[in-house]
């Protein structure tokens, strides 16, 4: 069998790039939303926007957190088994 290290490296770089770029896009969009919320003049509108956007940001954060934890756990399990036959 041939070595798959080069393929794994390329795949890791591609996946890492996709994750970083998508995360940056999401963070930038949330920063712009927060900027606009903070510049609202109406207190009622401000609280309504914070309530709506806040819950959405929490859900998206949990989604990424659990995905990251799962990825790190699976990667560490894979590396732990490398020395075994």
Curated annotation (Swiss-Prot):
Its main location: membrane. The chain crosses the membrane at residues 13-33, 49-69. It is a multi-pass membrane protein. Residues 34-48 are extracellular. Keywords: Cell membrane, G-protein coupled receptor, Membrane, Olfaction, Receptor, Sensory transduction, Transducer, Transmembrane, Transmembrane helix. The keyword Nucleotidyltransferase does not apply. It is found in: Cell membrane. GO terms for molecular function: G protein-coupled receptor activity; olfactory receptor activity. The keyword Lipid biosynthesis does not apply. Residues 1-12, 70-85 are cytoplasmic. GO terms for cellular component: plasma membrane. Belongs to the G-protein coupled receptor 1 family. Odorant receptor. This is Olfactory receptor-like protein HbT9. It comes from Apis mellifera ligustica.
């Amino acid at each position: 069998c041939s070595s798959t290290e080069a393929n794994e490296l390329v795949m890791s770089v591609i996946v890492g790039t996709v994750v970083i770029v998508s995360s940056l896009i999401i963070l930038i969009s949330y920063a712009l939303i927060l900027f606009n919320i903070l510049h609202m003049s109406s207190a009622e509108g401000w609280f309504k926007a914070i309530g709506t956007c806040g819950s959405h940001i929490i859900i998206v954060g949990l989604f990424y957190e659990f995905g990251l934890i799962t990825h790190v756990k699976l990667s560490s399990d894979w590396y732990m088994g490398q020395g075994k036959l």
